Amino acid sequence: SMTTDPIVIVGAARTPMGSFQGDFSSLAAHDLGGAAIKAAVERAGIAPDSVGEVLFGNCLMAGQGQAPARQAGFKGGLPQSTGAVTLSKMCGAGMEATILAHDQLVAGSRDVMVAGGMESMTNAPYLLKKGRAGYRMGHDKIFDHMMLDGLEDAYEAGRSMGTFGEDCAAKYQFTREQQDAFAIESVKRAQAATASGAFAAEITPVTVKTRKGEVTVSIDEGPAKAKLDKIASLKPAFKKDGTITAADRKSTRLNSSHITIS
């Protein structure tokens, strides 16, 4: 039955944010999801078998194996008895998972839920659409799962999501200079927050195996590697005379964030 008890967040964690083909290239999305789940459940101080269900957003599912959210749950130390649902919603999948988890708790369907999101754009595979039927003769296409199912419009084939940002910039008259200034300030704030340790409490470090041994990643990769003096000279990313550059757009990244609510 529906509960009148307040719904509260009892634990939260995220991995560092990795760059495209960067520190987390060897890890699948469910590896990152598992790391975030494990940390958040530990921080909540609850028994893993008390979690009723995992709801995790993940839009680029191809190539990961069956049920990525369930794999993340196992890697996060949750038992086989804990159910899991992987859901897809462009950009807002993790937030949608959290909303739906809240609603299940309000409805009284569950007592404890795990919710969050995970993505690894680096590991999104290339697709052979005609592979099952066979290629008869001549050249054909392979499709980028990241672009086709994540970053391109489904209704105007091949149109990048970034071009809609250009439409907004034109409509609201955001100049290149304004966007560059905003990007620079944003990176500076992220760098300052990292240096001061402001993000440390929310991040769970992730250990990555490399050819040189194990490396522990504990800070966000993008801000640490950003070159602010290069921003003003970057070429437009989506149209020849556009105002949006690689510095202004949302980065292509790999990470997972997760909360436990009850």
Residue spans of the language-model regions?
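Conserved catalytic cysteine-centered active-site region
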Residues: 27, 58-112, 155-163, 225-249
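Beta-strand segments within the central parallel beta-sheet cores of soluble alpha/beta enzyme folds
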Residues: 49-57, 83-88, 113-117, 180-185, ...
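Conserved active-site "lid/cap" helical segment
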Residues: 2-59, 63-64, 68-76, 83, ...
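Flexible glycine-/small-residue-enriched beta->alpha junction loops
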Residues: 112-168
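Acidic, glycine-rich active-site loops and adjacent beta-strand->loop/helix elements
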Residues: 13-16, 57-62, 89-93, 117-124, ...
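N-terminal extracellular/periplasmic Venus flytrap/periplasmic-binding protein-like
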Residues: 8, 13-15, 26-34, 178-253
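Active-site-proximal alpha-helical scaffold in enzymes
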Residues: 89-119, 169-198, 253
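Single conserved hydrophobic/aromatic residue that forms the stacking wall/gate
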Residues: 254-262
